[in-house]
Amino acid sequence: MTQESSSSNHYVDESSFDNNNNNNNNGGEGSSNEILIRIPFLHDSVPALYAMFALASLFVLLATILSAHLIYKHLKYYTQPDHQRYIVRIVFMIPIYAIYSLLSLLLHNYQVYFALLRDCYEAYVLYMFFALCVSYGGGDKNLVTHFTSHPVMRLPMPLFFKFKPNEAFLQVCRMGMLQYVLVRPAVTLASAIFEIFGLYDEGSYAINRFYFYNAFIINVSVTVALYIVVLFYQAAAEELAPYKPLLKFTSIKIVVFFCFWQSIAISGMTNFGWIPTLDGWNSGEVSTGLQNFLICFEMFGVAILHQYAFPYELYRVRAFSAAPLIHRVEMGTVFKSVINSVSQKDMVKETVKSFKGTKITDGKTGLYSGLKDEVFNEFDIEEIEMGDFTSANDNNNFDDFDFSENNINSNNKDNNSSIYNDGASKKNHIGSAILAGGGGGGKKDNDLITDDDFFSLMNNDYANIDFSNFDQDALEEMNFDDDDDDMAFTARR
């Protein structure tokens, strides 16, 4: 780089670093203390900010294409709505975050208003991620049961004292996540209002500017939310393990937590005078533009990460493994899937649970009430006692199977006579067909062998078996020296 006149597009004025604080106050207007960066492959007359916008647009386009493809695949193979509705909402965060950051880079004077919409969806997605983890864990009552039986654990740093989860643990986690959902949009809305009256001042930590309070409040809120996420993951690790949650947690942390602390770090650099002016922008505007540019680039990386963190192939396998589902998934449920994923009924239920909580013990007695299975009317079956079976001819007549010889002979003879129905079965497979005492037409009666003989067959102990009950012709074909395992296996069957 070379130092030139103020009309040149690429120069460095060394005094810009010494007088940077003054530039913050006068907005950089009419000042020669500017730094322009030479961008490779671009003509010298192209301003650096235009080059940043061009590069950011490329990353945003790629990130949007990747995310749109993943969302479409999940909607096409929408076989598990309890999971995929949350996945679709989480993945949709990438285009929203990237596009709003790109618009903030282009229209930097209105970036605080774009940030309002972006931050609202960011808080919403964090809550959806928590709801997805609850769904992965089998629902509220399953997780509460798991937490109450969980051994004593140590809290994550910086708190290391021991902690025993109880029934209220899931509700505490929900409230910890919900506070961020409420605080982040509220503070961003307040920032937009203060910006209208000129009292926001992006990047300034003066106590008479709202940016200082904005950064402090959101920092506390996001730290609590992050701590709750880590604590929940630590307590529910066993339940979440089959879903490989590490990549999912990483993608959420990058978007929600890393991006926020990155903005705080850049603002701190501005406050210390480490961010110069650029193309007529003061250092505060440059820091905001740099943050938006980095987000555009980072969203492309997160979009790639989402391909592995939230793959659609698992649900595609589920679709093709069930014949009645193939036609429905392939032939036109994408629109219905969109409606289901957009509906916010589950969000309302989650919010109600945050205040109501989930109990698995009786509030009056304190006794365990157990998990209640969902009841589906189409599967209503009349309960019968163990050992009672309904007669095929009379629905109101119940026979005691254990003492009904007719039931034994009529219901068991087919199964007992052909344990192996293929012609290649070995001759020493013992079935009821070799029991002695034949009936008419060479058919064998189905008298049961004694318990002692049965367990002797299972243990390959032939010395204690009374072979007088077996058909002698069939026994001559048996080989008791070879293939003992097959005989024991047949006895077990």
Swiss-Prot record:
Record has Membrane as a keyword: yes
Pfam families (UniProt xref): Solute_trans_a
InterPro entries attached to this UniProt entry: Ostalpha/TMEM184C
Residues the record marks as carrying a glycan: N415, N416
Membrane topology: Multi-pass membrane protein
Family, similarity comment: Belongs to the TMEM184 family.
Function comment: Probable transporter.
Protein name per UniProt: Transmembrane protein 184 homolog DDB_G0284525
Record organism: Dictyostelium discoideum
Lineage: Eukaryota, Amoebozoa, Evosea, Eumycetozoa, Dictyostelia
